[in-house]
Regions:
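Non-catalytic interaction/Regulatory regions outside core domains
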Residues: 1-112
Length: 112
């Protein structure tokens, strides 16, 4: 299994986690207290499930191909963002991160 520590090498990354299909935390690295990591894993799993459903609906209504299965999602706040690909989620500081580098690192880990 690929190491989540690779994500912490991306400038601006503050923490990352991997979750199981039921939403339980598999592992976490960085500045994420265990109780926050547990909640974040549940949130990431729930959001991923919702995005899969949204992608299915969008593909069905639009007739466009290539939307399913959805692979990931992102949510941006004022200072921090959350990026998810597969069952890996990374938390970053917006003012420091290169989103291109983050996506490359997430892709390497998620597609191994």
């Amino acid at each position: 299994m690929a190491s989540l520590d690779e994500l912490l090498q991306v400038k601006g990354a503050v923490g990352a986690l991997r979750f199981y299909d039921d939403g339980t935390l598999a592992e976490a690295v960085g500045d994420l207290p265990r109780e926050h990591a547990d909640l974040a894993a549940e949130m990431a799993n729930a959001t991923s499930t919702m995005m899969h459903q949204e992608a299915d609906l969008f593909a069905s209504y639009s007739g466009m191909r290539g939307w399913t299965p959805s692979e990931g999602w992102a949510m941006q706040g004022d200072q921090y963002s959350v990026w998810n690909l597969g069952n890996i989620t990374c938390f970053v500081r917006n003012g420091e991160v290169s989103y291109n580098e983050l996506y490359k690192a997430l892709s390497r880990l998620a597609h191994r």
